[in-house]
Amino acid sequence: MADQRPDPDQLLNRVNAEEARAKRGKLKIFFGASAGVGKTYAMLGAARQQLLAGVDVVIGIVETHGRMETEVMADGLEYLPLRDIPYRDRVLKEFDLDGALARKPALILMDELAHSNVAGSRHAKRWQDIDELLAAGIDVYSTVNVQHLESLNDVVSGITGIRVWETVPDKVFDAADEVVLVDLPPDELLQRLQ
């Protein structure tokens, strides 16, 4: 008669994998069809709800693009200081991954998931920074447009005639714990972009 007991190594591997998943932060993506539909605004609104519920929320990086209503929504939220990175003949401000890991908030806002970091950063892409934050047990809210997804980049480019070069691997999007669709009727979007 064959031994029906489970393999102890397999059990240990399964338990370790489940513990790692339980400790990993959660990723929530605010997803839109184009710039200007209100992804950042929606992300800030959701973050404010978490703050009211007592969650330790900080802004890692948020791009308001000069929109007053978005700037107002960010008022009162803690901003992590950005890091100065010398680049050619100037100094650029970039997200400070080490500062965020040291601060270890419960939730961090990281706008523009597809952003390419400045040379000299630890990771080439913001989504890689986010993966490190998640691995450290920090929940992350981020934003992305459809044309930035690797598998849809060519399709959207073929329709719009505009190619974007900053993309996110589909596996990053697929691994999100939650995706919130943010959209506007076309005439409202056109009015907002004027």
Give residue ranges: language-model regions.
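Conserved nucleotide-binding/hydrolysis micro-motifs of P-loop NTPases
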Residues: Q49, E63-M68, A114-H115, V140, ...
